[in-house]
């Protein structure tokens, strides 16, 4: 993979693929919890095959020490997917994605509490402007409890909260890293999501038609399995700031897909809100941790 594609090309490809996931999720007729479970299963199978082909091994001793954190982070990853998929149901793909990209702001807010890091003026400005961006994409006229649009944004922010939890827990997991850690988190997500799905909606694969199967396999194998391989292979080779900049191809792609493929509209105010969220979260990442 490394010989065929440059690290920059791998990351750009991964971000472009990540940005199209909403298009496929919309056409899979199962619950969000069930879809998250299948995504984890298919991705784990794909990564397991990748490890076999590349002859990579994961140290069992390191797994034992990190097991509680891996279970917690894997569970958070699973529920992060569930809430993001729910967000796609209630609002546009672009607004759901922009809400989801509030995750770095949540991490910035919690790091001082967990790691005794100080928030400087720059971090406070980024928090304030990103929050303003969320208010703008919500729309003042939609701030009512019965609004489907607002419900979608809340699901997106909930997904951002769980994703921020995964990021923060990863800082405590030191024995295993990168794609190996993600593979173990997929397994942990499966362990958490199986009882959740059985206790809620149950298994409903009989509802999935031919197109649904194509979309499901695409989300699990391509958007998660293959694309995670590209993503982590690229991260090992690229400088942190370049990776941070290129990662914003994901939400930009999602917005373009939402508007030009799905025909979903964005008002000028929502566009300004999206620019505030993405612009200030990117600024917060640049010049930070390397």
List each language-model region with its residue ranges:
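Membrane-interface interhelical linkers
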Residues: 1-13, 45-72, 118-124, 142-151, ...
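Transmembrane alpha-helical core positions of polytopic small-molecule transporters
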Residues: 14-19, 43, 73-81, 103-104, ...
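Hydrophobic/aromatic residues within transmembrane alpha-helices
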Residues: 28, 35, 39, 87, ...
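Transmembrane alpha-helices of multi-pass small-molecule transport proteins
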Residues: 30-79, 106-110, 162-166, 183-201, ...
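Specific alpha-helical transmembrane segments that line the substrate/conduction pathway
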Residues: 34, 41-45, 85-116, 159, ...
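Hydrophobic transmembrane alpha-helices of multi-pass small-molecule transport proteins
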Residues: 47, 51, 71, 119-141, ...
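Helix-helix packing/entry segments at the starts of transmembrane helices
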Residues: 96-102, 169-190, 224-260
């Amino acid at each position: 993979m490394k010989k065929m594609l440059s690290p920059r090309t791998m990351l750009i490809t991964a971000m472009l693929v990540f940005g199209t996931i909403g298009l496929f999720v919309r056409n899979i007729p199962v619950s969000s919890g069930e879809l998250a479970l299948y995504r984890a299963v298919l991705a784990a199978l794909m990564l397991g095959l990748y490890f076999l082909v590349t002859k990579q091994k994961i140290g069992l001793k390191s797994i034992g020490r990190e097991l509680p954190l891996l279970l917690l982070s894997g569970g958070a990853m699973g529920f992060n997917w569930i809430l993001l998929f729910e967000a796609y149901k209630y609002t546009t793909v672009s607004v759901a994605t922009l809400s989801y990209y509030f995750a770095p702001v949540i991490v910035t807010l919690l790091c001082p509490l967990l790691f005794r890091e100080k928030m400087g003026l720059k971090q406070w400005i980024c928090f304030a402007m990103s929050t303003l961006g969320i208010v703008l994409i919500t729309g003042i006229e939609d701030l009512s409890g019965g609004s489907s649009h607002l419900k979608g944004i809340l699901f997106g922010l909930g997904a951002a909260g769980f994703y921020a939890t995964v990021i923060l827990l990863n800082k405590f997991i030191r024995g295993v890293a990168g794609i190996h850690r993600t593979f173990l988190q997929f397994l942990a997500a499966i362990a958490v999501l199986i009882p959740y799905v059985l206790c809620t909606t149950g298994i409903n694969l009989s509802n999935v038609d031919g197109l649904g199967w194509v979309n499901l396999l695409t989300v699990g194998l391509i958007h998660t399995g293959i694309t995670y391989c590209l993503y982590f292979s690229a991260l090992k080779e690229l400088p942190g700031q370049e990776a941070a900049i290129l990662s914003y191809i994901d939400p930009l792609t999602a917005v373009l897909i939402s508007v030009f493929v799905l025909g979903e509209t964005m008002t000028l105010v929502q566009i300004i809100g999206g620019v505030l969220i993405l612009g200030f979260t990117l600024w917060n990442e640049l010049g930070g941790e390397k």
